[in-house]
């Protein structure tokens, strides 16, 4: 027991030492905008950012949902496939170029002690762990929804079989009246039960068939709709987690020079992330209310983060050791989730899953769109 207490004290001491403030006067000056601090102008720009990012998110996530019945925006159209590939490139670049870089910047800050934060590559390790955790979550969620789908299929089959059995039983109870003539030429009714022989096909078309829910695959096959449900929910989780961080970072800034380029960059980023998420929601065929809730939750997350950041900007110290550690770890987690989702559930699923095996032209367009999306989002790192 004594050793355990000593171990806890030692761990607490190491944690306190790891969060001790380092020498970071230059970092604080840089965060303040190097002479570009203006609280009033920054607050106005935050209002503009909230409105612009909200509109971009609503339009981005709403286009695939509103266009489900329009030929040009259906989920199997060439335009939709190319746009979704572009959005996948944007999300991939967000994870690698933006979130992972921000995590490295936060956890290597001189405001943090060199040990342990600069003695081990925490950003890459945490991102890898988050990607593996997302894989496990993806697997478990797919198994859960697959089980629900299979149970629903069995329920429909059982109901159809019961209806067919009831129909056959009612037919067996029907008696048919026939008329025979006796030797005295007198006609007499004869009641004969009308029964079906179950050893050969039924001759009457009752219209009862064993129905299956739409989108069910073969035995052991995961239906595409089940995968789309899982992908859309995990993708939203990853997007929302880093949207909160981005919103808070912008909200606590007091420098118009820092905020101004972020408005355009985040609007672009929000639009195409929304388009990818909206496409996944459309493919999952959620009910209208569920789709609307998911879309609204995505659209308001970044503006809400900006508002929260603006509210605490007067006393929040973004360069405090605790703030840097939390920001760095959350950025790393978000990077891992986004990298996994973009590579596995968006790019590999569409490019290697057989959806684009028909048209060479469509394949070329999708690859060009993917590379352009990644390049465009990467180039925004110059300003934001």
Curated annotation (Swiss-Prot):
It is found in: Cell membrane. Residues 185-222 are annotated as: Disordered. Residues 1-25 form the signal peptide. InterPro entries: ZIP (IPR003689), Zn/Fe_permease_fun/pln (IPR004698). GO terms for cellular component: plasma membrane. Its main location: membrane. The chain crosses the membrane at residues 47-67, 80-100, 120-140, 228-248, 262-282, 292-312, 324-344, 364-384. This is Zinc transporter 7. It comes from Oryza sativa subsp. japonica (Rice).
